[in-house]
Amino acid sequence: MASAIPYLPPFHCHDIPLHSIGVHSFEALTLSVFQEIWGSGSPLLVTDVRRCFKFQWNPEYFIENYGDKECFIVDPQTDYSKKVTVRDFFTEFGNYAGRGTTFSGNSKKAWKLKDWPLSAAFQEEFPELFEDFSNAVPMPSYIRKDGVLNIAAHFPMNAVAPDLGPKMYNAMASDQTLGSKGTMRLHMDIADAVNVMTYATDCPDGSPGCAAWDLFRPKDLGKLQRFLKERLPKSCLDPVYSQQVYLDEHMQ
């Protein structure tokens, strides 16, 4: 578990249609560049963000500071959830040998701790991490909860503002083999989202850990829905909005 700073892996398959996205370092991203890309509705990848954080945001940190707190973790393959301590979950983080296999026997179980904390506000539950996150994000005028250009910061004081986070998402490594449900199913965000990868455990072969994202352009939503409906059971709900579909290697 020595790899605390994620790296950018090469594209895993050149047969998959790819659309270029903007890639900028934290230092090189200017307001005008961001506004042009964001205004077009395109995804943007910003590198070197992790180096802007003060805290480690790794398993050891959460075990030391929140180990006794209880939380619910979920098995994405079955949606089975159970209550454990934060220490229990993060102790197994990166432990491939002791995780057991899924019902198909094809892959290791990949427990996830999603949207943590579930009920309390992040700012109240983790004030030091909230401050660390707020001070580290790129384009703070847009992204910070109190950013002057963040529309969510301007709700009337007597109104109930939506909870737009931040939230933490922690998941053990999964794979894309046939039948896998990964750790994040296909879905559509209800608002623009900022995702910061703060930690990745090394893979069993020693290579750096990473997170794989499949992003689709909004204008391709109809094509994606038709493609999936042709390949899924007729009784299946909307393949995007139901959040029940995972794009395994066969679907890709």
For the regions a language model picked out, list residue spans one by one.
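Active-site region of the double-stranded beta-helix
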Residues: 2-40, 50-252
